[in-house]
Regions:
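Hydrophobic/aromatic pocket-lining and membrane-interface residues
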Residues: 23, 37
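Short, glycine/acidic-enriched loop or turn micro-motifs at the edges of active sites
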Residues: 26-27, 92
Length: 214
């Protein structure tokens, strides 16, 4: 099932639905993740920064994160042929908050068109680059909606249970050190309180004129 379908049924489903999302379209997904997910028929969405196809994760330059190879256009087509949904992760992987109207349109719309031309189908979902509360704003969300996307995901922590907020979809981040027990607790909602803490911290910092560096 597509992410859009899961969002649409989340309010009335008899049991929780889960999909897996991958930001950045790292090349190593093809070797380490997609074959396993395909074997178990597990749905997943891969969010592609179209301006970096066949390059490295240059946005991590100067950070503690190593530069990672990004899928090529052929890799993206291969992933789609395996049954995985493809979404846009903008063109340049830059923060959308505060961009000019022209640049914002390029980041949101040009990436959508490039993927649609590549795959021959509509691209229905978008992932905000970096995805935090200070990384995009209402203007960006409006452009995403007007471009024809049906949903947009953030890095706001938590389970998503409100289909009316389809342009601010929450996600549960899984870290490399998480155990199976911790993963189950996250899915069951034991860490939902972190979402309220995240909102409170953002509101305090906004009220005091500070921004959270990401």
């Amino acid at each position: 099932m597509s992410l859009d379908g899961i969002i649409g049924q989340c309010e009335h489903a008899d049991r929780p639905a889960v999909t897996i999302t991958f930001d950045d379209a790292f090349e190593n997904l093809l070797e380490h993740a997609l074959p396993v997910l395909s074997e178990h028929q597990a749905p997943a969405v891969i969010y592609v920064p179209t301006g970096h196809l066949g390059k490295n994760s240059e946005w991590d330059h100067g950070s503690a994160h190593p530069l990672m190879p990004i899928m090529t256009a052929a890799d993206v087509k291969n992933a789609r042929s395996m049954g995985f949904e493809i979404g846009s992760h903008s063109r340049s992987h830059i923060r959308l908050r505060g961009l000019s109207a022209v640049t914002l349109q390029q980041e949101v719309c040009d990436s959508k068109k490039m993927l649609e031309d590549l795959l021959g189908e509509q691209i229905r979902t978008f992932a905000y680059p970096h995805g935090g509360r200070n990384d995009f704003d209402g203007r960006a969300a409006d452009v995403v909606k007007e471009a024809g996307y049906r949903s947009a995901v953030t890095t706001f922590f938590g389970r998503h249970n409100d289909p009316s907020h389809r342009y601010e979809v929450r996600r549960i981040i899984i870290w490399p050190g998480d155990t199976t027990h911790e993963l189950q607790r996250k899915i069951d909602g034991h860490y939902d309180w972190l979402a309220f803490k995240e909102i409170a911290v953002h509101n305090v910092r906004t009220a005091t004129g500070r921004t959270l560096a990401r």
